[in-house]
A protein has these predicted regions:
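Short, well-ordered beta-to-alpha junction loops that form the rim of enzyme active sites
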Residues: 22, 62, 88-95, 137
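Phosphate-coordination/substrate-recognition cap region in phosphate-metabolizing enzymes
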Residues: 1-47, 155
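Active-site-adjacent alpha-helix immediately C-terminal to a catalytic or transition-state-stabilizing loop
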Residues: 3-4, 74-131
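Amphipathic, non-transmembrane alpha-helical scaffold segments
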Residues: 40, 65, 69-73
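Acidic, His/Gly-rich catalytic cores of divalent-metal-dependent hydrolytic chemistry
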Residues: 135-155
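Short glycine/proline- and acidic residue-enriched helix-loop micro-motifs
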Residues: 46-67
């Protein structure tokens, strides 16, 4: 879905979409392909901990928030000098976007669930050499009547 979204954004501007694995969603490992109900049933203790202390959880055969944060931050560090003074559009997934927002606000990963996101919500972060400013977060105005006040909390 992220690639389709990126292509829809790029097409009218004649831009080419480039993919970066560093912006992939957190690897849920053994949870991949399961519904929330199935995860709760098969991994009740781990799921509870994911809700309460996500920063302390590594999913079986999956990733931790620290690992996701490291790869996303690495991609930002790689992109910044290549696009200094330019506007770029990164299209990613729930956990990486939440971590980018937390980083811009100077908040730790344990605040993951403090950030509410809607599907296709737009977030704008301006980066300097030593700073980040959150300009817009989870804007869904482009969806018009499709969205009401119900930003989802999918975790």
């Amino acid at each position: 879905r992220a690639r389709e979204t990126a292509e829809a954004i790029a097409r009218p501007h004649g831009l080419v979409v480039r993919t970066a694995e560093a912006l992939n969603e957190i690897c849920h490992g053994a949870w991949e392909g399961l519904t929330v109900e199935e995860v709760r049933a098969r991994f009740p203790d781990l799921y509870r901990r994911w809700q309460e202390t996500p920063e302390a959880v590594t999913m079986p055969d999956g990733e931790s928030l620290a690992q996701v944060e490291e790869r996303v931050r690495g991609e930002l560090i790689r992109l910044q000098p290549l696009h200094a003074g330019e506007t770029i559009c990164l299209v990613s997934h729930d956990v990486p976007v939440r971590l980018l927002i937390l980083g811009a606000l100077g908040l730790p990963p344990e605040r993951l669930w403090s950030v509410g996101l809607a599907a296709t919500g737009l977030t704008e972060i301006e980066y300097g050499r030593e700073w980040a400013t959150l300009r817009r977060m989870n804007s869904v105005g482009h969806l018009g009547e499709l969205v009401t006040s119900c930003a989802h909390r999918a975790h």
